[in-house]
Structures are given as C-alpha cells and as structure tokens.
Amino acid sequence: RMEVKEAVILDFLMDRMIQAVLYYDTDRELNAIDSRVLSFISDNYKKAYSYQAEGKSEAEKLYLRLLLVTDYVCGMTDSYAKRLYQDMNGII
C-alpha cells in the first residue's frame, strides 16, 4: 500500500511541477498558479538551471527545465514530498 501512495504523490508532484516549468525562462508569461508552484523550487536549483541553459537552444532548455524538476523532486525527503502534496491538494 505504501508504494502505491508514494507513486501517487510522486506522479502528482512531477506532473504539476513539469506543467509549471514548461514555459519558465521563455517569452511566454506564466500564469499565477505556475508562478506559485515555481516558487517552491529553491533558488539553488534555478541558478544551476540558468548556468546550464546559457546559450542553449530552446529544445535544450526544455530538457534542462525537465531535469530541474526531476532533480528537485528526487531531492525531496518522503515527509516533505507528502507534506507538499497535501498542501497543494488542500489536505489538512
């Protein structure tokens, strides 16, 4: 049962975070929700992305944005991922 719960949490976080970063660092304006979701990602991860993305094509930047999310979610503790999932879903 625990693995199923964890898979649901990770799937949700990955889906939501990926949606939020799709247009990060592009000419397209982010909506309020995506901006808020991006605010959860630490500046260290964003700085690493910016460093790596400098001078890259849009396709390469998209790959790096997806990697940004993967690195962020993989770096979460189980308890933090669960708490973030609950917060994002309004679960108390």
Regions found by a protein language model. Give the residues of each.
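Histidine-centered, transition-metal-coordinating active-site segments
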Residues: 1-92
